Amino acid sequence: MDINYKLYLITDRSFLNGRSLAECVEDAIKGGATLVQVREKNISTRDFYNIAREVQEVTTKYNVPLLINDRIDIALAINADGVHLGQSDMPIELARKILGDDKVIGISAGNVKEAIEAEKAGADYVGLGTVFFTGTKKDIDEPIGLAGLKEITEKITIPSVAIGGINKENAKSVLATGVDGISVISAILKNDDIQGASKTLANI
């Protein structure tokens, strides 16, 4: 599957202030988001499924790929385009057996070793970070920074996406490290003008 990783939106309903997630995703796509990941923690499988279906209606309308965070069962249930897995989630090889060769599998990596191992195991892309301190994850290790990002991108050949504290002020310097795109949550979803925020990032 040919994926444009340039502006990768990850969902977080805690930033929406009562707004519909599907509408916010649509605004982000209209602004230039090229890939969407539904990320939900601490909700029931039924609720996750329903949310993913609502978002999928939007991504399908605009022909934007949809990935599911962690939950391979949800990805299978809605026939999503793939999954994004963390270091403590199911091994890539098993995920590939379950999902098949035509689905996208992304892996989080925080250093060169993890990124190289992900590529060897068959990951389609790696999410690199955390790049900067972020308000989204409270229990992260020390950020890898721009130097860490550049070091990793020079050691792998699969696409890479930077994540963690990325916004319109630092996105240009992040992209200059050689990553294929940026992953954002609050830089888009915290804005009253989601489409405008997305457009600003897409044009960097």
Curated annotation (Swiss-Prot):
Cofactor dependence is on:
Mg(2+)
Q: Which InterPro entries match?
A: Aldolase_TIM, ThiamineP_synth_sf, ThiamineP_synth_TenI, TMP_synthase
What does the record give as its pathway?
Cofactor biosynthesis; thiamine diphosphate biosynthesis; thiamine phosphate from 4-amino-2-methyl-5-diphosphomethylpyrimidine and 4-methyl-5-(2-phosphoethyl)-thiazole: step 1/1
Which Pfam families does this entry report, sorted A to Z?
Answer: TMP-TENI
Task: Provide the binding site for Mg(2+).
Answer: D70, D89
Instruction: Output one GO MF annotation.
Output: thiamine-phosphate diphosphorylase activity
Which residues are noted in the entry as 4-amino-2-methyl-5-(diphosphooxymethyl)pyrimidine-binding? Q37, V38, R39, E40, K41, N69, S108, K137
UniProt enzyme class: transferase
Q: Which domain of life is it from?
A: Bacteria
Any single biological process term in GO: thiamine diphosphate biosynthetic process
Q: What is its EC number?
A: 2.5.1.3
Residues the entry annotates as binding 2-[(2R,5Z)-2-carboxy-4-methylthiazol-5(2H)-ylidene]ethyl phosphate: T134, G135, T136, G165, I185, S186
Please give an example of a GO cellular component term from this record. Answer: cytoplasm
This entry's comment on the bound cofactor is:
Binds 1 Mg(2+) ion per subunit.
Keywords attached to this entry: Magnesium, Metal-binding, Thiamine biosynthesis, Transferase
The record's catalysed reaction(s) read: 2-[(2R,5Z)-2-carboxy-4-methylthiazol-5(2H)-ylidene]ethyl phosphate + 4-amino-2-methyl-5-(diphosphooxymethyl)pyrimidine + 2 H(+) = thiamine phosphate + CO2 + diphosphate; 2-(2-carboxy-4-methylthiazol-5-yl)ethyl phosphate + 4-amino-2-methyl-5-(diphosphooxymethyl)pyrimidine + 2 H(+) = thiamine phosphate + CO2 + diphosphate; 4-methyl-5-(2-phosphooxyethyl)-thiazole + 4-amino-2-methyl-5-(diphosphooxymethyl)pyrimidine + H(+) = thiamine phosphate + diphosphate
What family classification does the UniProt entry report for this protein? Belongs to the thiamine-phosphate synthase family.
Free-text function comment from the UniProt entry:
Condenses 4-methyl-5-(beta-hydroxyethyl)thiazole monophosphate (THZ-P) and 2-methyl-4-amino-5-hydroxymethyl pyrimidine pyrophosphate (HMP-PP) to form thiamine monophosphate (TMP).
Q: Which NCBIfam families match?
A: thiE
Query: By what name is this protein known?
Result: Thiamine-phosphate synthase
Q: Which gene encodes it?
A: thiE
